[in-house]
Amino acid sequence: SKYALDVLNSSFIDNVDGITGKGGAFYYRDNSRRAPHNLYTTGENLASAMKTYGYDTKLPENYTSHYRFTTEDSQNLLDQGEVAKKVSLYYVDAKPWFVYNETDGLYYRYEFGDKQIDGSTGEQLAVKNIILQNCYSSLKDSKNGTLDIDYLSGGSGMYITNGKAVPITWKRASANDITRYYTQDGQEIILNPGKTWVEIVENSRASQNKISAE
């Protein structure tokens, strides 16, 4: 949206713009897909772009990891959580859902009535952790239906892993800070090693998400 472009083109974000053409040299189009949803880049291209633009690649001295993780031999089992074998998300068109596989301990994602496949690997998307982050939302542009999602005010959510789910809260001190997630007793959540899927959920639709023991 034009609102996102305003933010991307500000000094707040190190931006490699492949939308308006400024950084077009670092992107390519996959002609097997329909434009405009066929623009891609690579890690090598982004590294080259950062060098070209002179972006700082060093972490600040006070940097801390975005997430906290357990070790492989000390899994967070969420013993007090509700059973979460299926997680159905309320999106009118895609109607996505996750199904828990007890054999490998991963959640496999589906949408549009079928498996969601990673185009680069040919494999179904699967993650170890799911975070549902409930956010306030409003219409920024009623004509085009552009949503304004509030990522700063904090709120509720769910943490899902190993076939269980627990309620959480989330906070973000400022736009320059990272989002932190907490258990109901105020402890920062400990994720299990593996991929983590953060699902942004509008507060108005959060009650329509379903976590079940199916």
Please describe what each predicted stretch is.
Residues 1-214:
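A surface/extracellular/periplasmic glyco- and lipid-processing/surface-interacting theme
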